[in-house]
Amino acid sequence: MFAKPTTRIVYLTAFALVISVLETLASESGFVPVGVGGYATIPPQGTRLPQSVIYKSDNLKKRLPTNKWWSSLAWDRFSNNMYPHPLAVRAMPEGLRVYYPGNNITASANAIMGSMPGGYADFVVGLSLVERFESAVVDDFGDWSVSALFRTNSTTMRANIVMGSPFVTFTFNGGIPAIRFANANAPKIIAGDEKSATLIVAIGNRYYGLFAPAGSKWNGIGSTVLTADTNGKNYFSVAVLPDNSAETLSLFQKYAHTHITNTVVQWVYDQEKCIVRTRFLFETKRYEGSEDAVIFALYPHQWLNTKTKLTDNTYNSVRGTMKVAIGREFTTEMVYPGVLPVLPVVKDANTDLMTTLIEREIKNQPRIVGDTYWLGKQLGKWTSLSQISAECGKDDMRNIFAGRIKMALENFFTPTNRTGSLKTSRDGVFYYDTNWGTLIGYPASYGSDDQLNDHHFHYGYFIRAAGEIVRQEPDWGRDEKWGGMVKMLIRDIANPDRSDAMFPFLRNLDVYAGHSWASGTARFADGNNNESSSEAVNAWYGIIMFGAATGNDEIRDLGIFLLTTEIEAINHYWFDVTEQFHPKDYRASVVTMVWGGKGVNETWFSNNPEMVHGINFLPFTPCSLYLGRYPEYCEKNYRALLGEKKAFLEKRGRKIGEQFKDSELWEAWTDITLMYHALSNPEDAFSQFSERLPGLNAEAGNSLANAYAWITMLKEFGAVERSITANHPFYAVFRKGNTLTYIAYNYKREPVKVKFSDNTELTVPPKSYRILQNQSKKR
């Protein structure tokens, strides 16, 4: 049922081998050719680079990922706070600090707080012979786990930390385990004594198990430092317990000395059933006892989509209730929502107006060089405009935008200037950093260079634009042309091949948390973060589009896995569409920024509600229909935005009377706001858009033509119908009253028959889409 990604992604292995050979020739030229383009291997003049020091052990030979919940461990001598829920941990000079935030989560109107406080609470696990370790480094890692090696001279302690595990397991060399408690008072011992291998301690409303090997004895009971005489054995475990019952103690004791040594994810897109099936495996080593299985806790997006048997035990987290299971693996099945590469311009649209709006964009001076984020947004705008132009029958206009896209991409994909010299950091170039195993685009922005932030946000625009060019001009995407460099970008942000010598496995997606992380370093007290969930989706959408356009199902299915996983997390942790997981005291309609230790209704850059909400809407592409899968939530979210905007303006001295029109409120991202509003009320969105159109300016990565096409399409077709799926990757279904509209796109050179889950069938012509409306369907 499952194939390992390393065996499925054949295209990367062969492509990486070619690049490896070429790299050996790059020392003199300073660049590696890839097709007709290439990348620099010498830092371009004027660049900022990531720090040279990576805190890893000599044991670690594979490519180290960035943008993980544990990334600060690799960037600093000791880590910042890390949040492998249900626990929070921190590598400190004294050892590994352990804390359970779940019983102290608080919520206000605009924040859900579950961070680890300052100091040493609840306790620090170290060694008796070591007052302060010299460093803590990455010794190994799995797909959602990390091993931290604490060392001082020949004395070492290795901590295995796994997201979802209530345990942290240790092995050590030199000394014996020492647990130092933060409070002035000794911890309350509620089970065990100095002669038992296991102690259960209470710290406030939190319960922990301290599991020493069989035959161990404890010293220091009654004090704030406990040491375990481990009877000559070198392993040890601690765990946060769901409660202090005898049954729970017995259960955790049974699995306490089975250590998780590796974590592995596998996935498959089941096209016929329209689901993504993801398998999570725990590799273990049994130090004592008879159990090879482990105890683990599932996040809501996991337990909602698994058939794995769950126990009655639970933990609290800032993402909601985590439910406990026991085993060596579990599987989730998530519905793939479907995407389309292009949307139709509907018959009710005013094509003369559309043409005028497109012409306005043509007159704007094109920006061919810029930093990878803002140029990327420009590429996204041109991509949509090229599609709309073609849909309007304006091939000449389509060619103008396609020409701009190719010019910008080809410039960035070419490492030398016209004289053959290497480009500077101002000229548009990709540089491969061998130390960190990453491709950095220059000009950079928002720490995409020295901190490796946001690569999925930036490069996603490039990949989607390339996918659209290849859809229309297949030859452009061949490896011998420009497709090889597009694959380099894909490998940087979402490499599915663990054996790749150049790039780490799945840089940006956290496969267990279910969503991306934006910070390359995670050097924050609240852990890592991800703000623009929609720009993450845009990256995965781009991978699907490029894979489909090049006829590479492996790339396409990689994108489908990433997109399906991310959207499921967005619906629960950003939007809480089922109203189950945001605390009742959190009154905002959305978490706009997810952190390891909190969720907040704010952005890095603005307090304007249009932007606070809109950063999780943009860019609007054909893929953005996923935002409308819960139209009732869209209406709730829009109404919340409306109220926030009125309050925002009133604080700035603007009086909002009862006769004030909604359309008059918007001053920043009007087009983005109304495109979102159209997902639940397209008639009102169209009315507001029409009122504002004469003097309206679009958000930088959008166009009024795109907004008009989107709103008029939803006005004609209605809301997204999520209950109907298809046995084909490229589909959408809408409902307006009792009329269902089915759309499917066919990338192939021959007709394809698409079957929807309600038994509707559609034969789609080659390289095109087909629309079917059926008025006989009723709810």
Task: Give the location of each predicted region.
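Sec/Tat signal peptide C-region and signal peptidase I cleavage site
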Residues: 21-26
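Polybasic, positively charged surfaces/segments
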Residues: 539
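Ser/Thr/Asn(+Pro)-rich, low-complexity disordered segments
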Residues: 27-456, 486, 496-515, 519, ...
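Alpha-helix capping and helix-loop boundary segments enriched in small/acidic/polar residues
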Residues: 373, 449-453, 457, 477-481, ...
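Bacterial N-terminal signal peptides
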Residues: 11-20
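Inter-helical turn/loop segments and adjacent helix faces that build the functional surface
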Residues: 389-396, 469-480, 543-557
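Bacterial N-terminal signal peptides that target proteins for export
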Residues: 2-11
